[in-house]
């Protein structure tokens, strides 16, 4: 019998083992769809971004006009730009749901996969931040100024780092040029990290909603999960295209319709919605260095998840107290997101401080205590 090239060809064999004949648990739910949706988001962003880069000019005098030109004069330029801008929002929706699923079902116990995933999140956040600066609108400029200026809180070397990052003494042409270069480079870094992420995942195999070893009950990825993923892709593209076509500016900031002006500060500087929870944590601490450390901790705390797992059970499927805590954490993050979009005044200040404190207390103290309590309850 002639050898099947799908199983014998060096390149096709790798693809086959990763996407076709991959043994997958038979009971993984729709929450396991988000990995492939993130891959789709990345491909969409790279493709639309490449097309936008062909028409963009990374110069402070021309950046804003070049974006307007893309939307007005380039064939379907408006659609490409809207897909790219809203694609970022959907990217973050997918990654937050993906992390939430990993947290709920104890997927973080695959330590290497989890740690590369957190690195992917950090790289994605960096990419989105530098990308937001490129249209050179008011919020782009002031967002860049405020966020990069935070590095000056680092003792001794902070100010030097900021001036080095800016390429001068303020956010100006050199800053825009290097941000464009970084925004072009980072997605390919994300793609590389994704391959590492998948390599680690396929080393151990997927987790499942029950959190038990599923080696005795596997099914091939294709056709079962390839079809399930195709449905997920359709369900993701539907709201994305709807938003890009009907309300492309829904999640944007109106300030960005005004070209950047260093002499006029917007009344309320805030980042895109997907950074608001971290921004609220940053603002809730009145000290600059303390705020920066809390901001970093809000994301880096994810690295501690495997160390803080004290339960005898992997998932939260049969742990009602941990479930209650998990959904409290979700509500807490929504409150932080809302607070981040509000001005710094009473009662938002105190709500933000309470929500920030609660965020860290739930993650670092209450989850391990609750897990230990549930372990005790198993004995009764």
Curated annotation (Swiss-Prot):
A GO CC annotation given for this chain: mitochondrial inner membrane
Record key words, sorted: Electron transport, Heme, Iron, Membrane, Metal-binding, Mitochondrion, Mitochondrion inner membrane, Respiratory chain, Transmembrane, Transmembrane helix, Transport, Ubiquinone
Residues annotated for heme b b562 binding in this entry: 84, 183
Cofactor binding summary note: Binds 2 heme b groups non-covalently.
Matching InterPro entries: Cyt_b/b6_C, Cyt_b/b6_C_sf, Cyt_b/b6_N, Cytb/b6-like_sf, Cytochrome_b, Cytochrome_b_C_euk/bac, Cytochrome_b_N_euk/bac, Di-haem_cyt_TM
Gene Ontology BP terms: mitochondrial electron transport, ubiquinol to cytochrome c
Residues spanning the membrane: 34-54, 78-99, 114-134, 179-199, 227-247, 289-309, 321-341, 348-368
Molecular function via GO: metal ion binding; ubiquinol-cytochrome-c reductase activity
Membrane topology: Multi-pass membrane protein
Residues annotated as binding heme b b566: 98, 197
Positions with a binding annotation for a ubiquinone: 202
Cofactor: heme b
UniProt subunit comment: The cytochrome bc1 complex contains 11 subunits: 3 respiratory subunits (MT-CYB, CYC1 and UQCRFS1), 2 core proteins (UQCRC1 and UQCRC2) and 6 low-molecular weight proteins (UQCRH/QCR6, UQCRB/QCR7, UQCRQ/QCR8, UQCR10/QCR9, UQCR11/QCR10 and a cleavage product of UQCRFS1). This cytochrome bc1 complex then forms a dimer.
Misc note: Heme 1 (or BL or b562) is low-potential and absorbs at about 562 nm, and heme 2 (or BH or b566) is high-potential and absorbs at about 566 nm.
Record-stated family: Belongs to the cytochrome b family.
Protein name: Cytochrome b
Species the sequence originates in: Oceanodroma tethys
Record lineage: Eukaryota, Metazoa, Chordata, Craniata, Vertebrata
């Amino acid at each position: 019998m002639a050898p099947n090239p799908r199983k014998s060809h060096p390149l096709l064999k790798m693809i086959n083992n990763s996407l076709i004949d991959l043994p997958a648990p038979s009971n993984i739910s729709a929450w396991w769809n988000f990995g492939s949706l993130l891959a789709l988001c990345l491909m969409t962003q790279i493709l639309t971004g490449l097309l936008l880069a062909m028409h963009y000019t990374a110069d402070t005098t021309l950046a804003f006009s070049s974006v307007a030109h893309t939307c007005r004069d380039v064939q379907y330029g408006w659609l490409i730009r809207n897909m790219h801008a809203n694609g970022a929002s959907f990217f973050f929706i997918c990654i937050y749901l993906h992390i939430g699923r990993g947290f709920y079902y104890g997927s973080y116990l695959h330590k290497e996969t989890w740690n590369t995933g957190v690195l992917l999140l950090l790289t994605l956040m960096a990419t989105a931040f530098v990308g937001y600066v490129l249209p050179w609108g008011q919020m782009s400029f002031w967002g860049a100024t405020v966020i990069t200026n935070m590095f000056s809180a680092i003792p001794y070397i902070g100010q030097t780092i900021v001036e080095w990052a800016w390429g001068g003494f303020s956010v100006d042409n050199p800053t825009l040029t290097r941000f464009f270069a970084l925004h072009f480079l980072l997605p390919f870094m994300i793609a590389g990290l994704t391959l590492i992420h998948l390599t680690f995942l396929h080393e151990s195999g997927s987790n499942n909603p029950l959190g038990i070893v599923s080696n005795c009950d596997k099914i091939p990825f294709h056709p079962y999960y390839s079809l399930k993923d195709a449905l997920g892709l359709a369900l993701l593209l539907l709201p994305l295209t709807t938003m890009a076509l009907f309300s492309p500016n829904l999640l944007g900031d109106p300030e960005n319709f005004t070209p950047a002006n260093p002499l006029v500060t917007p009344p309320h500087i805030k980042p895109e919605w997907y950074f608001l929870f971290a921004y609220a944590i940053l603002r809730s601490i009145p000290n600059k260095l303390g705020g920066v450390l809390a901001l970093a901790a809000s994301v880096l705390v994810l690295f501690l998840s495997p160390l803080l797992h004290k339960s005898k059970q992997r998932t939260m499927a049969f742990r009602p107290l941990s479930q209650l805590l998990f959904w409290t954490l979700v509500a807490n993050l929504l409150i932080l997101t809302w607070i981040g979009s509000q001005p710094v005044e009473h009662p938002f200040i105190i709500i933000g401080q309470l929500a920030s404190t609660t965020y860290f207390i739930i993650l670092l103290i209450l989850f391990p205590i609750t897990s230990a309590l549930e372990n005790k309850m198993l004995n009764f």
